[in-house]
From Swiss-Prot:
Binding site for Mn(2+): 299, 324, 341, 440
Organism: Shouchella clausii (strain KSM-K16) (Alkalihalobacillus clausii)
Biological pathway: Carbohydrate degradation; L-arabinose degradation via L-ribulose; D-xylulose 5-phosphate from L-arabinose (bacterial route): step 1/3
Assigned GO CC terms: cytosol
UniProt-recorded name of the protein: L-arabinose isomerase
EC number, UniProt record: 5.3.1.4
Length: 486
């Protein structure tokens, strides 16, 4: 699997020469101490840059950030007052994501010692407001985080934003391979691929299934045997598992990954209606590739496949999978949704050691496919779907509470997860349907609604979040406003 490179984030402190060189030296020293502490807690490299105290220095720094491929984004903070007209030229040219950090070096006011020297130096309270006005006046998208720089909650929010920017950078260079077309007559999996490349950076290429079959057939027996040994070390095998069927999935896994690596594709889709030349619908093979970090979705759903790859980058490839709303449990007061798919759920969400099972599957009209069977973990999670509204893309997300499933399903040998949608089954599903949310989603225990909203903001697309505070009336109003805004 292609590993995403590590990025840097630049920390730029704003000031001005009005207070003299001694004050600027103290600003630089405070900034250095802050960055050294933050570097210990943040998930990406934080690089301190010289204090920005003139229009020329600011423009130079922003141009350098634009031209540095290792720089994923910048973090700005105004230690003293920094007149915002100094920032106009730099902000006009900046093309990297920006986080405006409203903090100050001292946590507490030194009540007995505070004087005008202290006041002149520690002016974040109005310096950051001045800077914030200019960014808003110029209509520049950015993230704002407020709080003391040593606060664990604040550091986590900055770290979460860094991860989101990584996902943004991945999106801008993402290539998706489609094996076959969409499931016939299905609407929500369709979409404008040209607009997706313009807006999201996603390059989508279609391939006949024969191109893939040729690569699968070139896989050697030795390669299959080596992968089977890996399967035995990671999973249990059902006592009735047809070993030849499992070996076929190993061959498919190697073949698909080889095809993807040759074209630098990091996401892909298949469809059970385009399997000519294949013995099985890819099941275990797809689950394994998702576990390695590839994005995937079934039935030709390239949007969800790409979204899964992007969100796996955001989540560090932990606890994140392709998902489908499968069937409802409507017991009064215990309404829940069973999420699954025919075969393809990622084992990173498993609560137990997955089991390899070979069982019949009517879809695709091929030999019985091998798949990993397991139950998902309990815990707070979310579902996210990306849909094409014709004039724009919309990201729809719903926070859920995944629960331990006490029931076995011996006649349904699939991986699954059971959840309660928030705030309730009726409110969540009604709001989801009003928003046009798809039946295919990305399910994740690791990603927050704030990160999803931040990613959508970076991409310039609409985002609807349904959480424990939502109600249908509120969501319908938001949809109404967004139709006019977009």
């Amino acid at each position: 699997m292609h590993k995403q490179g590590k990025y840097q984030f630049w920390f730029i402190t704003g000031s001005q020469p009005l207070y003299g060189q001694e004050a600027l030296d103290e600003v630089a020293a405070h900034s250095k101490a802050m960055v050294e502490r933050l570097k210990e807690k943040l998930p990406e490299e934080l690089v301190l840059k010289p204090v920005a105290s003139s229009p020329e220095r600011i423009l130079e720094l922003f141009r350098a950030a634009n031209g540095d491929n290792n720089c994923a984004g910048i973090i700005t903070w105004m230690h003293t007052f920094s007149p915002a007209k100094m920032w106009i030229a730099g902000l006009n040219e900046l093309n990297k994501p920006m986080l405006h950090f409203h903090t100050q070096y001292n946590r507490d006011i030194p009540w007995g010692d505070i004087d005008m020297d202290f006041m002149n130096l520690n002016q974040s309270a109005h310096g950051d407001r001045e800077f914030g006005f200019m960014v808003s006046r110029m209509n520049i998208d950015r993230k704002v985080v407020a709080g003391h720089w040593q606060d664990a909650r604040v550091m986590k929010r900055i770290g979460d934003w860094m991860k989101t920017v990584n996902a943004y950078q991945e999106s801008k260079q993402l290539k998706i391979a489609r094996f076959g077309d969409n499931m016939r007559e299905v609407a929500v999996t369709e979409g404008d691929k040209v607009e997706a490349q313009i807006k999201l950076g996603w390059s989508v290429s279609g391939f006949g299934i024969g191109d893939l079959v040729e690569v699968i057939n070139s896989v050697s027996t030795e390669e299959v045997n080596a992968l089977m040994d890996e399967y035995r070390s990671l999973y249990t095998f059902h006592r009735d598992a047809n070993i030849a069927a499992v070996e076929e999935q190993a061959r498919i896994e190697i073949g698909i990954e080889r095809f993807l690596q040759q074209g630098d594709f990091r996401a892909f889709s298949t469809t059970f209606e385009d399997l000519h030349g294949m013995k099985q619908l890819p099941g275990l093979a797809v689950q394994r590739l998702m576990a390695k970090g590839y994005g995937f979705a079934g039935e030709g759903d390239w949007k969800t496949a790409a979204l899964l790859r992007v969100l796996k980058v955001l989540a560090g490839n932990v606890g994140t999978s392709f998902m489908e709303d499968y069937t409802n449990h409507l017991e009064p007061g215990q309404e829940m949704i069973l999420g699954s798919h025919m075969l393809e759920v990622c084992p990173t969400i498993s609560a137990q050691k997955p089991e390899i099972v070979v069982a019949p599957l009517s879809m695709g009209n091929r030999e019985d496919p091998a798949r990993l069977v397991f139950k998902g973990k309990a815990g707070r999670a979310l579902n996210a779907a990306l849909i094409d509204m014709g004039s724009r893309f919309r990201l729809v997300a719903n926070e859920v509470e995944a629960v331990e499933n006490p029931h076995d399903m011996p006649k349904l040998p699939v991986a699954s997860v059971l959840w309660k949608p928030l705030p309730s089954f009726s409110e969540a599903t009604e709001a989801w349907i009003y928003a046009g949310g798809a039946h295919h989603t990305v399910f994740s225990y690791e990603i927050s609604k704030e990160q999803l909203a931040d990613w959508a903001s970076l991409m310039g697309i609409e985002c609807i979040v349904i959480d424990d505070q939502s109600n249908v009336g509120q969501v319908r109003k938001e949809l109404f406003w967004n139709r006019r805004a977009y």
